Amino acid sequence: MMLFKLSIKNITKSIKDYAIYFFTLVLGVAIFYVFNAIDSQTVMLNVSSSTSEIIRLMTTILGGVSVFVSFILGFLIIYASRFLIKRRSKEFGIYLTLGMSKRKISLILFFETLIIGAISLGVGLALGIVLSQLMSILVANMFEADLTKFQFTFSSSAALKTLLYFSIMYLIVMIFNTIIVNKCKLIDLLHGNKKSEKVKLKNPIICTIVFIIAVIALSYAYYLVTDVFGTSPLMNTISGILIPIALGCVSTFLIFWSLSGLILKIVMHLKKYYYKGLNSFTVRQISSKINTTVFSMTIICLMLFFTICIFSSALSIKNSLSGNLKDLAPVDIQFSKLQESLSKEEKENFSKDIIEDYNTTAKDTLQRLDVYKYLKDVVDINTYRVEEITLKDSFGDQIEQIGKDYPTLAYNVREDLVKLSDYNRLAKLYNKKELTLKDNEYVIISNYKMMADIRNISLKNNTKLTINGKDYYPKYQECQDGIIELSGSATNTGVIILPDNALEGIHPYKNILAANYQADTKEEKENVEDIVSTIINNHFNKDTLLSYNTKIDIYASSIGLGAMVTFVGLYLGIIFLISSAAILALKELSESTDNKERFNMLRKIGTDEKMINKALFNQIAVFFLFPLLLAIIHSIFGIEFANYILKTMGTESLLSSIILTAVFLVVIYGGYFLVTYYCSKTIIKER
């Protein structure tokens, strides 16, 4: 009981030392609970069965991510406990001097960890429960759901999971603390804070060579990620993508290692700056620990890089996948059937019923299955493919240059061709602009920007197409926006619209039927879709190969995938950001503890408090900014890579999400910086 009371007294006395530790634990618990309680928030949402499936998948993935997050938080808690033991080394040394056994000191630490853990769990869970109510609004917004049934929710499963995971973490910390105390020597505990790392000036020539090599390797890694799917064959495989990642990690370490030897040497030669104010003291302070911070700086830099990229990308995913759905899925349902003649081998693999149905249109099949009566606003068209019009033919004389710039394109794939009258009927249904053509003109419609840009190269050069001996020329010098089939993203790489007579006598490649349901309300449409999908699914691969795609399914999968990526990104991003900032904060607080005597010496020789505070501020600022600056440089190229990928989903700008990411960094990272500075000021003022 006496040791327990002493533990409470120690916590009360050292409340300032525990501030960042406690704050980080509370944030960790709250975030862990919030993201594991998402399933409880979705229960109240009025969503379709397709969306419910996506939500269940998302919660399963978040559960898996939580295991990874628990390892990160566990490492962070152990790292923080090392700081607290070091901070109180003299106190423990006095306990040993007074005759207290190491077992009792371990017991004191056990009680302290237990108390801090229990309080942080309680406060963190309370904060998490409050934040999870706000998360309900975000989840509802993500899934465009009705929140009329909103009510206060508490996830017992998330709470139990949080208690279990963090209890295991605290137990590991207790074991770790016991091992540390048992290995400590009395002299180290009493005088450990007076030890300092000897400043070792690395060979500047070697450092310069290493720095140049690192910059070249990093530049090559940047080139690879910005040249994705371009001229570099390395980026065409998963293993190839790992090459710039490995180069980036190694180069980051080498840059920090080389700069740790160059910065001090360079600054010492800048005598006007070096001897101004307390700059010489500040530089020496930074250098005194520089050799042990290279690896940790590398890890923190990479974590910050990951945070910036994942925030910037994840916050754009939702808009990327759901922002243009009204244009991409303008009708309720679309059916399609291949019309090309079956080969002998294919006929042997299909049943008699399928072969009989194969030569009919989608409309015929729907009428036979008694599905057509559920549809209205019906438009059916054919698409065509001919051997003489491939992607290579569409590029004409520009094929050589385009082939060099984009070697991975499938140039021998036949182009999709559509009659002008068919397209205009479909465009009218889709609320798209109708087209007009002369007898010798064609238009290419595409909404996939990257492919449209490539096609525009040949269109600007008036590339002709030849069908049945007749030449056709582009009406426009660029692709026109348009779609034929429903999709969840802007992936129409190009469809060629031709005058009707150009395709007369050619056998159709595919028959497409687009329509709306004979229903008005959302609930009625969902009921009709259930009926239609059940009928089609029951007959598919039995007596028909009719396939279909629906607006409801597209919305559910696109919005669900966007929400999934966003939540996982936010979860990992916040944890990585907190971990990076907390590690730096604890390291700086530890250094402030080590250097307390040096700051006291400055006071004794007459240095005013303002200069001391400025020196402390500069020292902490360098440690916080150093990894952040390199992470930002990495992120410029990482975001460029992410932007390329996002363009395939319809997003062309990450500006808004980058601004939001900057806000996150300023609030969380900047907040830790300020707390570290003010806590360090308090530490160095202690006598």
Language-model features: locations:
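Short cytosolic juxtamembrane segments of multi-pass membrane proteins
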Residues: 1-5, 184-199, 593-594, 682-687
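N-terminal Sec/SRP start-transfer signal
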Residues: 1-29, 197-213, 257-304, 594
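Selective transmembrane-helix segments that form parts of the transport pathway or gating/packing helices
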Residues: 15-21, 109-127, 163, 167, ...
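Peri-transmembrane interface segments
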Residues: 16-23, 34-68, 83-86, 94, ...
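Alpha-helical transmembrane segments
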Residues: 30-63, 138, 258-259, 305-331, ...
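Small-residue-rich transmembrane alpha-helices
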Residues: 30-44, 79-83, 116-145, 158-183, ...
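Nucleotide-cofactor and metal-assisted catalytic machinery
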Residues: 325-563
